[in-house]
Amino acid sequence: MTPLLELKDIRRSYPAGDEQVEVLKGISLDIYAGEMVAIVGASRSGKSTLMNILGCLDKATSGTYRVAGQDVATLDADALAQLRREHFGFIFQRYHLLSHLTAEQNVEVPAVYAGLERKQRLLRAQELLQRLGLEDRTEYYPAQLSGGQQQRVSIARALMNGGQVILADEPTGALDSHSGEEVMAILHQLRDRGHTVIIVTHDPQVAAQAERVIEIRDGEIVHNPPAVEKVNATGGTEPVVNTASGWRQFVSGFNEALTMAWRALAANKMRTLLTMLGLSLIHI
């Protein structure tokens, strides 16, 4: 089998005063399409840094990371953003939903930045929310949703551009046991549909539901069992195809981003006013 994600001798260090603190110390790891993997470790073990590198949110100090055979170090900023946008979906413990957008609008956000036309975005967002049992909550704002419902919205958002690889950082950490079980059931369904699911957790009960549990300690992998071979793993759903021309894609994306920015300002009128006053005082 050829790995979907391949890390070779990955190291990551950060400056701390006059010294360099090494957080990851020579990580080598292969993850295959269709796997459900848990990465476990104590706080400050390096598991979150590893997740950020896997999701192309951070770059290694040294070593090689390949996604579907592509060395990410050879990509410029735009190409890296495209790779991240088209291949990865992120699920966070605290959901990270935009409070001024409805559930449907939150799900649409990744496709806005991908330049997908509004009609296509709307149809796909509605389809995903319906699949996750939220067809009657599309116009609700995050504050009107339970924690479990907010996490389902974030899962739909992660799938908006295809989500070949789902990276879930403590996905049940902020949920009660019933909602946590529902979220894990959804992640299992995604794995069954061919998605590659990577869960970062400190909860042994959550980790036990994965096919492979990788343990990291002090920046090093201390346990990494062999992968379970998959038959006909497809690597997730097909990415959404954008039929718009390059210029139309740019205009559509710019207009939608501007609209979202305006909504954010309108939703935080007092903060916006204070910011404007602060800027005015600076120039007096």
Language-model features, listed with the residues they occupy:
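ABC family nucleotide-binding domain
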Residues: 3-207
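Conserved catalytic segment of ABC-fold P-loop ATPases
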Residues: 209-215
